[in-house]
């Protein structure tokens, strides 16, 4: 079997189809959503779909350009040779070694598509090819409740807003939630970098603690609470905040500072509570120092930007040696969601699955053929062959596309 053609696409979601209820364009939450995907075709009629994890922020055009360069390198190769292709991307791209998000997101998209083809070729879900599912359902948490929950995006400004969003998720059966308490002031204005970093003013620390304390009291002691930092604080301010909130039984503290192994260890050692990070850490080489210095207890590789399924499995195996858990970062289309569910069903050190608020958006749902939803805070593992999802006809006809043959 040979790769004959590759389509690289920047999708154009119907962002008028928000489902209603969007009360604020928080960091252009809806407006700047543009998934980057690929479809790899073969001479046997099989094809595979993959996603590059650059859904928000900057870098979409750069990622698509990187994918076009990579595509030329693998035309004519056997799509079942995912390890050979991965190393070709990494070693023969020259500047690709020790790369960043654009390079690894591009590799991830192709790797995902190759595994999709492999699953279809053997007529099994990729979980079977990864070694078999240890679990048929996955506990998940409601993620990013500062935006709101469900179709009604009601961003939290006042302390009661955080409480209301948390209780809404808990009422739907979730026994774990994640919230960023750090970003917005009481009036909805964003805190500046100077206000979030360095030695903090009492007002900021008091406000964060007030919000965390209120949510913990509302949800009770049996619901796990993940505190999301988004690296908006630095190591110094993260420790100040962490000292105030750790008494509220934090499940783990995510991205408390810019990802660097030494500063992450400084925060971990100072606070003595579980730490998570990973959506901006790429490849086993970048994860290795965090694993070796034990500064993270939960690694969060994104299968659409860490280097793909091939690389994520290696990262998980490395972490397993050190009793470090895995929670895949998931913020994309159903391609990434289904892939993560397959992957997390296999690994022994799975912690919990992330169910991101973006996956409620109708414009995201119409990009793929499958729409996976949890029931009472648990996802069923996909049974469809391949990664378990494909691009929809809408996606294929609403995109900017480059074809490489």
Labelled PLM ranges:
Residues 137, 142-261, 265:
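Metal-dependent enolase-superfamily TIM-barrel catalytic cores that perform enediolate-based chemistry
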Residues 133, 139, 219-228, 268-278, ...:
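Short beta-strand/loop segments at the ligand-binding rim of alpha/beta enzyme cores
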Residues 243-252, 258-378, 382:
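Shared catalytic-loop signature of beta/alpha-barrel
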Residues 1-49, 53-55, 358-365:
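Structured beta-strand/loop patches that form or line metal/cofactor-binding pockets in enzymes
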Residues 41-121:
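Metal- or metallocofactor-binding catalytic centers and their adjacent structured scaffolds
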Residues 38, 43-44, 49, 81, ...:
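Ligand-binding pocket scaffold of soluble enzyme catalytic domains
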Residues 3, 45, 70, 110, ...:
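Conserved, mostly hydrophobic/aromatic
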């Amino acid at each position: 079997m040979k790769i004959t053609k590759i389509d690289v696409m920047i999708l154009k979601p119907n962002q008028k189809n928000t489902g209603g209820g969007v009360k604020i364009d928080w960091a252009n939450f809806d407006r700047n959503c543009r998934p980057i995907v690929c479809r790899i075709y073969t001479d046997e009629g099989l094809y595979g779909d993959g996603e590059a994890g650059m859904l928000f922020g900057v870098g979409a055009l750069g990622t698509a350009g990187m994918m076009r360069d990579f595509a030329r390198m693998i035309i004519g190769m056997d799509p079942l040779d995912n390890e050979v292709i991965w190393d070709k991307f990494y070693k023969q791209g020259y500047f690709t070694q020790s790369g960043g998000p654009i390079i690894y997101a591009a590799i991830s998209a192709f790797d995902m598509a190759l595994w999709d083809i492999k699953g279809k070729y053997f007529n099994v879900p990729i979980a079977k090819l990864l070694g078999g599912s240890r679990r048929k359902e996955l506990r998940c948490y409601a993620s990013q409740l500062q935006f709101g929950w469900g179709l009604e995006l009601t961003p939290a400004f006042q302390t009661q807003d955080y409480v209301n969003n948390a209780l809404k998720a808990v009422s739907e059966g979730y026994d774990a939630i994640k919230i960023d308490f750090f970003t917005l002031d009481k009036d909805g204005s964003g805190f500046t970098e100077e206000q979030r970093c360095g030695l903090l003013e009492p007002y900021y620390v008091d406000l964060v603690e007030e919000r965390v304390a209120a949510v913990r009291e509302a949800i009770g002691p049996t619901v796990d609470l993940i505190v999301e930092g988004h690296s908006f604080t630095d190591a110094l301010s993260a420790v100040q905040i962490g000292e105030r909130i750790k008494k509220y039984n934090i499940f783990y503290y995510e991205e408390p500072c810019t990802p660097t192994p030494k500063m992450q260890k400084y925060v971990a050692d100072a606070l003595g509570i579980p730490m998570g990070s990973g959506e901006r850490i790429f490849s086993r080489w970048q994860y290795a120092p965090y694993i070796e210095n034990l500064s993270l207890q939960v690694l969060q590789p994104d299968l659409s930007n860490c280097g793909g399924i091939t690389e994520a499995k290696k990262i998980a195996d490395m972490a397993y040696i050190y009793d470090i858990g895995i929670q895949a970062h998931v913020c994309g289309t159903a391609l990434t969601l289904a892939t993560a569910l397959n992957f997390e069903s296999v690994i022994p050190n799975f912690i919990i699955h992330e169910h991101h608020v973006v996956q409620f958006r109708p414009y995201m749902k119409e990009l793929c053929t499958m729409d996976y939803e949890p029931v009472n805070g648990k996802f069923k593992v996909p049974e469809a062959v391949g990664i378990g999802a494909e691009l929809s006809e809408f996606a294929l006809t609403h995109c900017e596309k480059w074809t490489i043959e």
